[in-house]
C-alpha cells in the first residue's frame, strides 16, 4: 500500500507544470522597451509546432503601466496574416509573477533578466485538465545572444519541455511584424 501511495504521489507530482523559480527583486520599469523573441519552448508540441500555433507569439514591446501592471505587445499569425495583440498582465504580490487572461494562459512569470540584453519568461496555465507551460528567451537586439540562450537552456532543464525553437538573426528580423 505504501508503494502504491508513493507511486501515485510521484505521478501526480510529475504532472504539475508549476514554475517555482522566479526572479527576485524584479524592477518592472527596467524591462520597458523593444524585445525580440530569440527562442521558445513548450510543454506540449501543439503549442508551438505551426506558424499559427496558440503560443507561437513574438513579443514586440513591454510597457509597465502606472499601476504596476505590464502591457505586452506581441505579434501572432492568425488566418494567414500577422496580427497585433495587446495583453495586460496584472501585478500580483510577487514582483515577477503576473496574472493574465489571454492565450488560454493564466500567469506570466519572469524567470531572469539583466534588463539590458535578455529576459526569460514563461506563460503558465495551471488549470486542470489543460495544464501547459510555454517559455521564451527575449533579447533587446535582433542578434543571437549565446549567453542568453545558455541561461534559457539552464532554466528549461527543470521544466517539462517537449519542443524548443531558436531563431537566427535573419529570422529575428523576419518575425511576424505589422
Swiss-Prot record:
A GO MF term: long-chain fatty acid binding
Cysteines paired by S-S bonds: 82-176, 122-135, 122-137
Keyword entries, A-Z: Allergen, Disulfide bond, Milk protein, Retinol-binding, Secreted, Signal, Transport
Domain of life per record: Eukaryota
Entry keyword annotation includes Disulfide bond: yes
Entry GO CC: extracellular region
Keyword Transmembrane helix found: no
Signal peptide stretch: 1-16
First-listed, main subcellular location of the protein, grouped into a coarse class: secreted
Tissue: Synthesized in mammary gland and secreted in milk.
PTM info: Alternate disulfide bonds occur in equal amounts in all variants examined.
Cell compartments where the protein resides: Secreted
One Pfam family in the UniProt entry: Lipocalin
Family: Belongs to the calycin superfamily. Lipocalin family.
Subunit structure: Under physiological conditions beta-lactoglobulin exists as an equilibrium mixture of monomeric and dimeric forms. Interaction with LMBR1L which mediates the endocytosis of LGB has been observed in PubMed:17991420, but not in PubMed:23964685.
Role, per record: Primary component of whey, it binds retinol and is probably involved in the transport of that molecule.
Protein name: Beta-lactoglobulin
Native source organism of the sequence: Bos taurus (Bovine)
Amino acid at each position: 500500500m505504501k508503494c502504491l501511495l508513493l507511486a501515485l504521489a510521484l505521478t501526480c507530482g510529475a504532472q504539475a507544470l508549476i514554475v517555482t523559480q522566479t526572479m527576485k527583486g524584479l524592477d518592472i520599469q527596467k524591462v520597458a522597451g523593444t524585445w525580440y523573441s530569440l527562442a521558445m519552448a513548450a510543454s506540449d508540441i501543439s503549442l508551438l509546432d505551426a506558424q499559427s500555433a496558440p503560443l507561437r507569439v513574438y513579443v514586440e514591446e513591454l510597457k509597465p503601466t502606472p499601476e504596476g501592471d505590464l502591457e505586452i505587445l506581441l505579434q501572432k499569425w492568425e488566418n494567414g496574416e500577422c496580427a497585433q495583440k495587446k495583453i495586460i498582465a496584472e501585478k500580483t504580490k510577487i514582483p515577477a509573477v503576473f496574472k493574465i487572461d489571454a492565450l488560454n494562459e493564466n500567469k506570466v512569470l519572469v524567470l531572469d533578466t539583466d534588463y539590458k540584453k535578455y529576459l526569460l519568461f514563461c506563460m503558465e496555465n495551471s488549470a486542470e485538465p489543460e495544464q501547459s507551460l510555454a517559455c521564451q528567451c527575449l533579447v533587446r537586439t535582433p542578434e543571437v545572444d549565446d549567453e542568453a540562450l545558455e541561461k534559457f537552456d539552464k532554466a528549461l532543464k527543470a521544466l517539462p519541455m517537449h519542443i524548443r525553437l531558436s531563431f537566427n538573426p535573419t529570422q529575428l528580423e523576419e518575425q511576424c511584424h505589422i
